[in-house]
Regions:
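Non-catalytic alpha/beta scaffold blocks inside enzyme catalytic domains
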Residues: 1-204
Length: 205
């Protein structure tokens, strides 16, 4: 099975960058970021934050302030960011880490310069698509209700981030805009790819 890995890789690169990925440029392999360490997992990212080596963090459906054992270190790390964006159906401790609540969150709010943007997202029951779990179940589900208020689907939120970043690169250029401006984004509605489109693409459409 894995003897077909080169074919899988080419299929992936063509799905990502379409006509910009050719045999002549090694299927745009140079577009992919290369690891200089074994992995950039969430533990390493927070360590880099604490060292002042990470300026922006998108926190999607994750409450780091409660997930990690060293709350003080996580707060210190978040305080060193220039920008924190949280995407979550609920207001989390991470999204409000800068607020002083006495013994529950004793921080110096005035000393924290991190800009925090909270983007309300839908919860799983308001979304459509695939669910997997540790029991290896793969289930497709449909929304039970519309997201309340200003909450949006994660796909809509991430699409808006991508489209705006791409527009900035197209207008202003940059050090290496090619992976962003050449990214394939040929969905029926560019503002909100459907779960069906995404599932087909991941399966090698």
């Amino acid at each position: 099975y894995w003897q077909n890995y080169p074919k899988f890789m080419v299929s992936f690169m063509k799905a990502m960058w379409g006509d910009a990925a050719t045999a002549e440029n090694d299927w745009a392999y140079h577009y992919l970021p290369k690891l200089d360490v074994p992995a950039y997992d969430v533990l390493r990212i927070f360590e880099m934050m604490d060292q002042g080596r990470c300026n922006i963090y998108f926190c999607q459906g994750f409450n780091g302030l409660l997930a990690f054992p060293d709350r003080g270190k996580v707060t210190r790390a978040l305080s060193k960011l220039k920008l924190l964006v949280t995407i979550d159906p609920l207001e989390t401790e991470t999204s409000r880490f800068w607020e002083n609540h006495g013994d529950h969150n004793d921080v110096d709010t005035a000393a924290i310069q991190t800009e925090v943007i909270q983007l309300p997202s839908s919860c799983f029951a308001e979304d459509e698509g695939a669910l997997v779990n540790s029991g290896r179940w793969l289930q497709w589900h449909w929304p039970g209700a519309e997201p309340p208020g200003e909450a949006k689907l994660d796909t809509w939120i991430m699409a808006q981030v991508f489209l705006r970043v791409r527009d900035l690169y197209l207008k202003e250029g940059g050090v290496f805009p090619d992976p962003i401006v050449n990214l394939t984004w040929d969905y029926a509605d560019a503002n909100e790819p459907t779960p069906e489109e995404l599932a087909k693409e991941m399966n090698g459409r």
